[in-house]
Design a protein with these regions (language model features):
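Transmembrane helical cores of multi-pass secondary ion antiporters/exchangers
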Residues: 1-298
């Protein structure tokens, strides 16, 4: 309960400072990260977490799933059709070039092995949706640029994700079972497409009608179904989440619109909780062990 109490206190402070953060360089994400660091086991000791703690992996998985699910919903059928234009160029050229440049920099400056450097590049190269949403909300930014960032930030996580999964498998050290890996990725995509398509068909049938207060919960229950089924069948949870979000946006605009505000809130809560936990894992000892080249790369 101590962990929940700390999260509630930091969340209340972040909400009260959110308007100031929106108008300045302050960041609610940094607030949670710093709070986790201060409350971690090496300082105040209120969050005595280790990388092996079950809450760390579970919360990180749920946070990434919810972010990918909501990110996928940024991209509708029209966006996919027109993605070959500016967003397509940003994805097909900008994303790989950024990945390559980041990997070279990580290898040259931080001294990481090439495989680890490419993993860092794959993780860092997609446009941060939080950064993109801050720009998209500004009316003084040209509409074409706002549309580019909105579509590109929605699609790039899904495109970079298979690269991250493959590199993680290769870095594990054991021989990669490419057939099993392909089956895992393919099953995740298939599940993420099939289940929302069926759910949209059911929702539009004349036998069912969703009342107002329950409208956001249909897509929420769909997300829970995809998460649990993917976990039970060993399909890739994250590709299933992203594919499901894109499919929902393509097959049912109503379902996407009903879920939008609620889904963004849920994803934000999971993301902030994950940042609090991540901050608790950063210790002064760890910071002292990082060489100057690591800070230069960061």
């Amino acid at each position: 309960m101590v962990e929940l109490l700390i999260f509630a206190i930091v969340l209340a402070i972040a909400v009260l400072l959110s308007d100031l953060a929106h108008r300045s360089v302050l960041s609610t994400a940094v607030l949670f990260l710093v709070a986790g660091f201060v409350c971690g086991r090496d300082l105040l000791g209120f969050l005595p977490l280790t990388p092996e703690s079950p809450v760390v992996s579970h919360l990180a998985e749920l946070a990434l799933f919810s972010v990918l699910f909501t990110d996928g919903m940024r991209v509708g059928a029209g966006d996919l059709f027109h993605a070959w234009n500016l967003p397509g160029r940003a994805l097909l050229f900008g994303l790989p070039l950024t990945l390559l440049a980041t990997a070279i920099f990580a290898h040259a400056v931080a001294g990481l092995p090439w495989m680890a450097s490419f993993l860092v590049g794959a993780v860092l190269s997609p446009t941060d949706p939080v950064f993109a949403s801050a720009i998209v909300a500004r009316k003084e930014i040209p509409g074409r640029l706002r549309h580019l960032l909105n579509v590109e930030s929605g699609l790039n996580d899904g495109l970079a994700l298979p690269i991250v999964v493959v590199l993680l498998a290769m870095l594990a050290g054991a021989a990669v079972a490419w057939g099993e890996l392909a089956l895992e990725l393919g099953a995740g995509i298939a599940l993420g497409i099939a289940l929302p398509w069926i759910a949209a068909k059911i929702e539009r049938s004349r036998f069912f009608a969703i009342s107002g207060p329950y409208e956001p919960l249909y897509a929420f229950s769909l997300g829970l179904l995809i998460y649990t089924i993917a976990s039970l069948t060993h399909a890739n949870v994250y590709l299933a989440a992203f594919a499901a979000g894109v499919t929902v946006a393509c097959v049912s605009k109503k379902l996407r619109d009903d879920f939008h505000r609620f889904g963004e809130t849920v994803a934000e809560l999971f993301k902030l909780a994950a940042l609090l936990v991540f901050g608790a894992l950063i210790s002064p000892t760890l910071l002292r062990e990082i060489p100057w080249s690591g800070y230069l790369f960061a």
